[in-house]
From Swiss-Prot:
Its EC number is 2.1.1.33. The keyword Phosphoprotein does not apply. The active site is at residue 130. Catalyzes the formation of N(7)-methylguanine at position 46 (m7G46) in tRNA. S-adenosyl-L-methionine binds at residues 56, 81, 108, 130. One of its GO terms (molecular function) is tRNA (guanine(46)-N7)-methyltransferase activity. The keyword tRNA processing applies. This is tRNA (guanine-N(7)-)-methyltransferase. It is an enzyme of class 2 (transferase). Pathway: tRNA modification; N(7)-methylguanine-tRNA biosynthesis. GO terms for cellular component: tRNA methyltransferase complex. Keywords: Methyltransferase, S-adenosyl-L-methionine, Transferase, tRNA processing. Substrate binds at residues 134, 166.
Length: 223
């Protein structure tokens, strides 16, 4: 979905109390100059407890991560997205379910690496990231060597990373980087998987499936 279409999304912002409960906003200036003053991506810093933490990068309107939070109340979940209106919908979804174990951060994840903490994450989800269709945008793709390096530092040994894309070119890049990296073990014998049928699908997944796009997937484990 293009940013223009996302910009036309009609959604009412949460009231101040609800926003304070669920939402954090980090500007690029804060992340670049004041990262040490911001809470890190860990359960103690975000939730004040020691529960396992799972991270959804590019969570959109929150269908998938809210399902995860409902299904596992003994863990914490944080969704990151750059688009505030999408997060407003995600917050409404969390509020309607009265979820106590979820927060959302409005920020550019590429600037959030200083907030990662060693072995703080049980799982990371990167589902349907922006492929940057135009050649000049491809160098800005989130999934790259730096992403793999930072996730290896942040994910606990035995933790996992789930990667899903409908873009064949992005998939080929992911496959090449994973095979070259060597620090992650596939949770499946095949080089990759096709199809993705979670109990709750995001609006992006539904949209691409309606268009008949092939979905490529990797499930990785940090040894």
């Amino acid at each position: 979905m293009t940013r223009r279409k996302l910009g036309r999304m009609k959604v009412r912002p949460p009231d101040p109390e609800t926003a304070q409960r669920y939402l954090l906003r980090f500007t690029g200036r804060q992340l670049y100059h004041e990262a040490e003053r911001l809470p890190g991506l860990s359960s103690p810093e975000l939730f004040g407890d020691q529960r396992p933490l799972e991270l959804d990068v590019g969570c959109g309107t929150g269908e998938y991560i809210c399902h995860l939070a409902r299904s596992d109340p003994e863990a914490n979940f944080v969704g990151v997205d750059l688009h505030l209106k999408s997060l407003h919908k995600a917050i409404r979804r969390a509020e309607e379910a009265n979820l106590q174990n979820i927060k959302f951060i409005c920020a550019d994840f590429r600037q959030m690496y200083p907030l990662l903490r060693p072995s703080a994450l049980r799982a990371v989800y990167l589902h349907f990231p922006d492929p940057g269709i135009k050649p000049r945008y491809r160098k800005r793709r989130l999934f790259n060597e730096r992403f793999l390096e930072e996730m290896h530092r942040a994910v606990v040994p035995g933790g996992r990373m789930s990667l899903v894309t409908d873009d064949e070119d992005y998939f080929r890049q992911m496959l090449e980087l994973i095979e070259r990296d060597g620090r992650w073990r596939r949770a499946h014998e095949e080089p990759y998987l096709t199809g993705f049928d979670p109990p709750v699908k995001s609006r992006f997944q539904k949209m691409w499936e309606r268009r008949g796009r092939t979905i490529y997937r990797f499930e990785l484990v940090r040894p």
